[in-house]
């Protein structure tokens, strides 16, 4: 007999060789039905794995994040199974879990399009209903290679060749087998709420020199209700797509001459200026001096900073006069150069620097997505150089600034995470203990709840991540606060302490909105293009009922502009209904409509974008009304 301890501290006896599914059944049939896998002594295992010794057991169900991930990973296998049934000559490659779903890459011998997805999905449902048990076997590497070679799965052979392990796991359901680390669901019957969503191209291993594969995306949920809710969200997200709204509002465009880099139009630049000016004022409030550093630097700087070894493949490089240069992928090393121009005393610290720095990263073309994933973007970077004793207070201030910014931009629902030490890291455990505690203390001081994520910190220090939830419930990773033990040492960022000794400065990195391009894309989707008054590219559209009011329209327009209102004058010889509809589609917050009565009484009639009639008032009163909203960030 063996003893199994449960999360509530209770201990029960079972026969040796029992599995997690059996344990779940002994508690309740409904629990067994919901069980996807289990943690056995902190190791995630398949639900059918035998337990032969005393252990701690935590069952994983579809309600757990790990359970949902296993469900989705198994659904990716079901997709591959269905594709092989329908297109036997297809080669399968990889099928990982992604946010809210999964994908699988295939090498089809025939042409496949979006129209084929319903057929594949139908086959998936047929296979799931067969309730095929899912099992695995562990085989030597050589046997796994021979197995997949015999099936003509050359990509699987290549994957196995690249893995250092000598033992491979092969999962099987019905007549389909796939290479995988697992774990997987016990039976295909639990896959009931899934849908294939789109199809795209993807190069094998992300290398454009390799074959272009067909990537099929899908989503999978614990219940049909969850699936329906998610699909409704996708439908709403489609309406909010910043690329479509950006075109309607004439904000920006992309073209093949400069892939992944936006061309900003007048209206887009107006939004950009509001975001940048707001952040500049916020930085001033929190004592950050603004700097501007070179876009290009000698490659040796990136070698010293460590970026060359980490980002070389994603860096744009050039040569000039027999010297190697690179366009910066990050702003940090050039900021350190500004710090290093002076000898600093501990009395000078903290020194806070902010930069709206343009960076370039050679992202794969297939990953580019409007403003949300680009090759050139402007980062609202901040770098603080301080003593170890000052770190906690500086992080407290950064957290305060982040929350102020997000609330002003209309994000009131967010999650905060602390990414803790990874296995491979620099620095001793004592330094990491202290650093991680500082981040926790700073969040506690701001009454912020947070989650801990062991192993997800950078090798050079732990970090805080801010995840914002938008109007339709999507989560966006936005700001970061990062402790850095590495770069100050590498680049010689030092100060003289009170004993006259040279010490390495502590360096804090922070980005609040992050990429301005991405943040503006987020804002557009969050507000569905109906930006709050203070951010709207055009705040008021002025129009007359007939051309007889043209002179008065011009007079009102000039008065609005003199009061700092971003106004548009519409003197076209069109019906007033047409003008109202057009400016409503352009998401202009307020429409000023002028007729004979308004002209004679020197007043204006105001209509909100929503269609609400605000009645009549003087231009001065309207400007005061607008200014109050703008100041309140409404």
Swiss-Prot record:
The keyword Zinc applies. Residues 241-532 are annotated as: Catalytic. The keyword Metal-binding applies. Disulfide bonds: none annotated. PROSITE patterns: AA_TRNA_LIGASE_II, TGS. It is found in: Cytoplasm. Signal peptide: none annotated. Zn(2+) binds at residues 332, 383, 509. It catalyses: tRNA(Thr) + L-threonine + ATP = L-threonyl-tRNA(Thr) + AMP + diphosphate + H(+). Keywords: Aminoacyl-tRNA synthetase, ATP-binding, Cytoplasm, Ligase, Metal-binding, Nucleotide-binding, Protein biosynthesis, RNA-binding, tRNA-binding, Zinc. GO terms for cellular component: cytoplasm. GO terms for biological process: threonyl-tRNA aminoacylation. Its EC number is 6.1.1.3. Its main location: cytoplasm. Residues 1-61 form the TGS domain. Homodimer. Belongs to the class-II aminoacyl-tRNA synthetase family. Catalyzes the attachment of threonine to tRNA(Thr) in a two-step reaction: L-threonine is first activated by ATP to form Thr-AMP and then transferred to the acceptor end of tRNA(Thr). Also edits incorrectly charged L-seryl-tRNA(Thr). This is Threonine--tRNA ligase. The lineage of its organism: Bacteria, Pseudomonadati, Pseudomonadota, Gammaproteobacteria, Thiotrichales. The gene is thrS.
């Amino acid at each position: 007999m063996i003893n199994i301890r449960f999360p509530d501290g209770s201990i029960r006896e079972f026969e040796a060789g029992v599995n997690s599914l059996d344990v779940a059944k002994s508690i309740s049939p409904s629990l067994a039905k919901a069980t996807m896998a289990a943690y056995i002594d902190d190791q995630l295992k398949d639900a059918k794995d035998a337990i032969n010794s005393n252990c701690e057991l935590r069952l994983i169900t579809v309600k757990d994040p790990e359970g949902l991930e296993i469900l989705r990973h198994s659904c990716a296998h079901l997709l591959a199974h269905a594709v092989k049934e329908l297109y036997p000559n297809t080669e399968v490659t990889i099928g990982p879990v992604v946010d809210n779903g999964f994908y699988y890459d295939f090498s089809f011998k025939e042409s496949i399009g979006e129209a084929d997805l319903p057929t594949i999905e139908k086959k998936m449902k047929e296979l799931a209903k067969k309730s095929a048990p899912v099992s695995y076997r562990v085989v030597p590497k050589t046997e796994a290679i021979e197995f997949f070679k015999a099936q003509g799965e050359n990509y699987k052979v290549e994957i196995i060749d690249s893995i250092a392990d000598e033992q491979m796991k092969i999962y099987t359901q019905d007549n389909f087998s796939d290479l995988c680390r697992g774990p997987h669901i016990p039976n295909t019957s639990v896959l009931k709420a899934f849908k294939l969503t789109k199809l795209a191209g993807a190069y094998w291993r992300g290398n454009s020199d390799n074959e272009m594969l067909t990537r099929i995306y899908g989503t999978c949920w614990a219940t049909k209700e969850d699936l329906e809710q998610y699909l409704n969200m996708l439908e709403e997200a489609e309406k909010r797509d910043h690329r479509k709204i950006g075109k309607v509002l004439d904000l920006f465009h992309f073209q093949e001459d400069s892939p992944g880099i936006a061309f900003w139009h007048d209206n887009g630049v107006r939004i950009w200026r509001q975001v940048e000016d707001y952040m500049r004022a916020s930085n001033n409030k929190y004592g950050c001096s603004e700097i501007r550093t070179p876009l290009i630097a000698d490659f040796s700087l990136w070698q010293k900073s460590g970026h060359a070894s980490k980002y070389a493949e994603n860096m744009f490089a050039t040569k000039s006069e027999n010297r190697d240069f690179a366009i910066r992928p990050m702003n940090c090393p050039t900021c350190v150069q500004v710090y290093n121009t002076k000898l600093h005393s501990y009395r000078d610290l903290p020194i806070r620097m902010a930069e709206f720095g343009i960076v370039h990263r050679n992202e794969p073309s297939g990953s580019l997505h409007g403003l949300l994933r680009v090759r050139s973007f402007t980062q609202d970077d901040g770098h603080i150089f301080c003593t170890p004793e000052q770190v906690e207070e500086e992080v407290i201030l950064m957290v305060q600034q982040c929350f102020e910014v997000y609330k002003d931009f209309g994000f009131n629902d967010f999650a905060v995470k602390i990414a803790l030490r990874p296995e491979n890291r620099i620095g001793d455990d004592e330094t990491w203990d202290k650093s991680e505690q500082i981040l926790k203390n700073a969040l506690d001081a701001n009454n912020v709840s947070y989650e801990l994520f062991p192993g997800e910190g950078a090798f050079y220090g732990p970090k805080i991540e801010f995840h914002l939830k938008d109007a339709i419930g999507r989560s966006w990773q936005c700001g970061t606060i990062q402790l850095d033990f590495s770069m100050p040492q590498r680049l010689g960022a030092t100060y003289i302490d009170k004993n006259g000794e040279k010490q390495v400065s502590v360096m804090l990195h922070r980005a609040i909105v992050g990429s301005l391009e991405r943040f503006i894309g987020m804002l557009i989707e969050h507000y569905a293009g109906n930006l709050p008054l203070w951010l709207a590219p055009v705040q008021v559209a002025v129009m007359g009922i007939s051309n007889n009011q043209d002179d008065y329209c011009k007079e009102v327009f000039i008065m609005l502009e003199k009061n700092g209102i971003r106004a548009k004058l519409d003197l076209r010889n069109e019906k007033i209904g047409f003008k109202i509809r057009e400016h409503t589609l352009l998401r202009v917050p307020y429409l000023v409509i002028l007729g004979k009565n308004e002209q004679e009484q020197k007043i204006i009639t105001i209509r909100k974008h929503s269609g609400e009639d605000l009645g009549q008032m003087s231009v001065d009163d309207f400007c005061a009304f607008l200014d109050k909203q703008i100041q309140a960030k409404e």
